Amino acid sequence: METGIYIELSENDPREKNRSWGYVLEAPGGWTKHETGECTGTMHGVTLQILIKALGRYHKPSQITIHAADEWILNMLQNQLPAWEQNGFRNAHGEAIKYQQEWEQLAEKVKDHKITIAPGRHEYSAWLQDEMKRGR
């Protein structure tokens, strides 16, 4: 089944701060599900948390395209996650990577899916920004 996850943050400022977030799950036939909320964290940390939350809604192996403005997270997901997993989520110096627990959770969530990435703004960006402003 081919589906999409569309993630949006109220701000793409990399610093730790309180921010709103939202995601839309889109499935074949036009079915969608969305959720919004608020939390405190960095852009990368919040993007990881929301991605884990959205992937938690999948119960069957799927082909998923992940759309998000956080290009770094998407690139690490596609290109670095397997190496981190093999190295016990440690960097080249043997130190735990930043957001180690989140990356471990993400590795578990994506293992049964075929993931593709689409960095940048997406068709739900403006709508999710409006929903976040309304607090829905």
Question: Across the structure, where does each feature detected by a protein language model lie?
Answer:
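RNase H-like nuclease fold core
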Residues: 1-45, 49, 57
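RNase H catalytic domain
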Residues: 11-15, 55-132
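Short, low-complexity, polar/charged sequence segments that are solvent-exposed and flexible
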Residues: 24-27, 84-87, 135-136
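Helix-coil modules at protein/domain termini and other flexible surface or pore-lining loops
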Residues: 35-36, 120, 134-136
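Glycine-enriched catalytic-core subsegment of oxygenase/oxidase enzymes
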Residues: 52
